[in-house]
Amino acid sequence: MTGADDPARPAVGPQSFRDAMAQLASPVTVVTVLDAAGRRHGFTAGSVVSVSLDPPLVMVGIALTSSCHTAMAAAAEFCVSILGEDQRAVAKRCATHGADRFAGGEFAAWDGTGVPYLPDAKVVLRCRTTDVVRAGDHDLVLGTPVEIRTGDPAKPPLLWYRRDFHTPTPTTPALA
């Protein structure tokens, strides 16, 4: 067996993988939780995906080194705010290490739980945490959506592509 065929050795390095994944457009989200002391935590995430329809499940990837990791991994519930094109500023702030991520005043507290969310987002999912799975240098947090709030469906989404924010441009007329 050659070194390249060794299953214990990664086939590509982290930078090559990062460069390749920069070609994959992903929706921009802000994920928020409350910690055990009631403090708000939030971070911008591009690694949020639908995992299952029955039962409904979403997955949020969070780096083990993230300042929000401990709170996110321990939270009983979390909110995923799917951002629109007009929410670049909050996306940038929530992605900035050391920033006061809640300084802009855009966040509200979910009734009955207090978990912060962005009421002007395209969609907000309030999720109950069902599992946390270690995957390399990240934890994958699985959650069941228990409530969904939708905003303006005509608002274009905010996407992350090639290490920058983008908004899709329709190539065909919208269907009525």
From Swiss-Prot:
One of its GO terms (biological process) is pyrimidine nucleobase catabolic process. The keyword Oxidoreductase applies. It comes from the Bacteria. Keywords: Oxidoreductase. The keyword Oxidoreductase applies. Pfam families: Flavin_Reduct. One of its GO terms (molecular function) is FMN binding. Provides the reduced form of flavin mononucleotide for the PIIA synthase reaction. This is NADH:riboflavin 5'-phosphate oxidoreductase. It comes from Streptomyces pristinaespiralis. The gene is snaC.
